Amino acid sequence: MSDEDKKCAPNKKFSEGSCFTLKDLKKMAISFNIFVEKGEIKSNKIEIKNDKKHLLLELTKRLENICDNQVCWLKQKFIKQLKDKDLLENTFRPNGPDGKFEWLSTIHINDVMSQYEKKYNDFKFFGAVPIDFDALPFLGIKDINYNELQDSGKSKLGFVFNLDEHWQSGSHWVALYSDLEKNQIYYFDSYGKRPEKRIRNLVKRISKWCYGKEHCQSNRCSELNTSDSYMRPKSKNRIEDKINVEYNHNRHQYKGSECGVYSLNFILRQLNGESYQNIVDNKTLDDKVNECRDVYFKFKKPFNQLK
């Protein structure tokens, strides 16, 4: 069995030799049989049983000449035609970059976080976005309705920003995490720098909402001074004194390739319940963070097709 077969999506469990569930395997076996009946696959049909080990063995035997792992199964026509998005995109970890030290792309980051939205029902990820996100209405960040998020059970928010604008090639990834229930807003830059002004403006909007929820009556929040600077190096404004707004001042990254992995790692550790202070105070160096790629991703290889 390939190691890639054990890299289940975060809300799936590897059991009885597979990340596929019994329901998945039955669906796949039924589709296989239909392709046999239509003459598109030359093989014996699979006996359908409510037995995961049986179905796994039967599919393995029929696919062993073209697939040396179960990830390859998802590339076969009889499975792709099911058009089951959860099966195709949320059984295994997403594809990672080709090189061990290759930068993470927007797609890599979004693919990872999309799977964690399925694991954590109270989590909403707003995407890996350029620094001019407020000028791009389709991203939906400038006009976030925090009341609606709270009402829908989405209390944990994640953002990954590239410090280049949308028309540029990309420079450095950073991350922001907020827990609306706990009134926490945490920023992480693997270089330990103060957040860029446009990120601070977003922090201001989230902070105002959290502060108003806890400290303002419905008709009094308009009196709140919104001109204060946020995330200053050595002092906090009135709102920051009441809620938990922090950014890291210490540098973790010293090499050139891991800012995207640092950003993923920060948000995922927050979702897992690790304290912000523990994350920022205990440096995780580049080589250690690079190892997380083997957890967050599977790695591409060419596939054959069954005939």
Model-based region annotation:
Residues 1-174, 180-185:
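Cysteine protease catalytic domains with a Cys-His-Asp triad
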Residues 112-116, 202-209, 295:
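Residues that form generic nucleotide/phosphate-binding pockets
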Residues 24, 112, 120, 137, ...:
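Generic alpha-helical secondary structure signal
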Residues 21, 105, 196-199, 285:
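A diffuse structural propensity rather than consistent per-protein peaks
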